Amino acid sequence: MIHKKMICKVLGDLLLIETAMILLCTGVSLFYGENDLPAFLYTACITTGAGMILALFGRNAERQLTRRDGYLIVSLAWIIFSAFGMLPFYLSGYIPSITNAFFETMSGVSSTGATILEKVEDLPHGLLFWRSMTQWIGGLGIILFTIAVLPIFGINGVQVFAAEASGPTHDKVHPRIGITARWIWSIYTGVTLIATLLLAIGGMSWFDSVCHAFAATGTGGFSTRTASIAYYCSPYIEYVLSLFMFISGINFTLILLFVTGHFKKMFHDAELKFYFWCIVGFTLSISAILYLKTTLDAETAFRTSLFQVISIQTSTGFATNDYMTWPTMAWGMMPILMLMGACAGSTSGGMKCIRIVILVRVMKNEFKRLLHPNAVLPIRINKQVIAPTLQSTVLAFTFLILLICFACILILMGLEIPLTESIGVVISSIGNTGPGLGAFGPAFSWNALPDAAKWVCSLLMLLGRLELFTVLLLFTPDFWKRN
């Protein structure tokens, strides 16, 4: 049974929270005295009205949520948040197309960072701040924020969290989820503030520092500059952002363990070690290629490689260099990183490293099984046996993401987008990365995509952000059955 009133109440509260965020951006617009102020005021009125109507409809709701309600709330929340979040762009006239405005907002809320803007600097400060804030909110999840608020209304947030964190994670957060959510948001905010301070020390304006800190911790990648991080020509800024993108790619429950003094448990985590060594391996490989086959000196080759590898693997999408100008072997590694992603339970997109670890262990077991058909070969990660059901889920997820990628690549090719560009756009969208390949690489916007392709990409961003099953489950007949 789906609790419609409770769902309306939660979504209404979400819209009221979005209104508060829009009002913050209204303050920024007022401070700079720019012409986007009316758009924010209209948006605040519309969003408040819609939120109050939904909250009113759910005022006498039974205070409980099922897992089914959780999946529905998560999917609707991202769509509704994006639909209302696009209004400042659209009403201000800076993005006069509904398709483009929704694409830009979904790209932010899903922490993808792909943009249709040809010149980012044309946007006034209020819209730039809202654009940056969408990825910061989306990075950790609109729903996770709500979980920290839900206990105020006496609602158990476990079912909602189960839908948002549908991938395999380090540890399930159970009855004390409200407390844990507050801890995570405190850490998230603290990391953002430290990043802001360090970027400002490096010469960025305070406004740019805040916006880029939002982008780095949310692994979104929206910059306030068309040239992205290349605009600043600062090795210091590149190293600082590399550090914070790396941190944001770590499972936040592990960061919580670190903050609470459980260092040993954190550093022995199998997924974290895989994530770290992937970055080391790809960075050294690309550094060697750039050093040997281009005119870059050793330090520049290393810094460029490190920044782009972390940026792409964490699905942030910042750019200091157009990797499409690199030797083919070097830029050919980018789609692998896009699809792989960082750690589960982080703000990054992609398949997540833990799934890769499980797949590798399953593959190794199959070789052993060929030699020892009757052997019992459990898969252990962090000293815990991975249940066959979880192994099946990982295999199903892998098959599904490859199937969706293949189908959408064909769809984009049917829209007369070349093969290389289609592959890059699809993998970047479903991996929530941002830059793609070819004409949609880091040096270009996605404005040239046909409108139909932009809607396909928006759907892929949503699917990637919510781990596929959360959204696709809504289209199965069993989901809507009463029992």
Spans of features found by a protein language model:
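Membrane-proximal intracellular helices of multi-pass ion channels
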Residues: 1-483
